[in-house]
From Swiss-Prot:
Belongs to the RimP family. Required for maturation of 30S ribosomal subunits. Keywords: Cytoplasm, Ribosome biogenesis. PANTHER family: RIBOSOME MATURATION FACTOR RIMP. Its main location: cytoplasm. InterPro entries: Ribosome_maturation_RimP, RimP_C, RimP_C_sf, RimP_N, RimP_N_sf. GO terms for cellular component: cytosol. GO terms for biological process: ribosomal small subunit assembly; translation. It comes from Neisseria meningitidis serogroup B (strain ATCC BAA-335 / MC58). The gene is rimP. This is Ribosome maturation factor RimP. It is found in: Cytoplasm.
Length: 149
């Protein structure tokens, strides 16, 4: 059986999930053969959503001859990764931690409020300052949830 490259798997996921009403947040294929798929939608993810996607993807991967040992479907969690411009638009007003590939004013790590994203440039405010970060310069970005007690 053909294991499938990451690109093949990504293409299948990007074509399949939107038709089911879900967004592909990320996926990973471990050395042990576990395929983890992180999904989301506006109203959040339930256990039933994970089961629905798992059943559907199992069939799709069988047809596409993609082999894996275990398939795990999950929500991305409260600290979900931010990868696309649409993620930064959707979560404008929320806090995030962003690590850049190249420093901006001598700094590579930013924790602040996402102000928005236009023309593939994310605007983040922190410590009374505002910085603009090109999407291509973002190495990692995650939401940073606030817990108020």
């Amino acid at each position: 059986m053909y294991i499938g490259s990451s690109m093949d798997i990504q293409t299948i996921l990007e074509k399949t999930l939107p038709g089911l009403g879900y967004e592909l947040v990320d996926f990973e294929l471990t050395a042990q053969g576990t395929l983890r798929v992180f999904i989301d939608k506006e109203s959040g993810i339930t256990v039933e959503d994970c089961a629905t996607v798992s059943n559907h993807l199992s069939r799709v991967f069988m047809v596409e001859d993609i082999d894996y040992k275990n398939l795990e479907i999950s929500s991305p969690g409260l600290d979900r990764p931010l990868k696309k411009a649409a993620d930064f638009v959707r979560f404008a007003g929320q806090n995030a931690k962003i690590k850049t590939r190249l420093p901006i004013d001598g700094q590579k790590n930013f924790i602040g409020k996402i102000e928005g994203c236009e023309n593939d440039t994310v605007t983040v405010s922190f410590d009374g300052k505002t910085v603009q970060i090109e999407l291509g310069n973002i190495d990692k970005a995650r939401l940073r949830p606030e817990f108020k007690f």
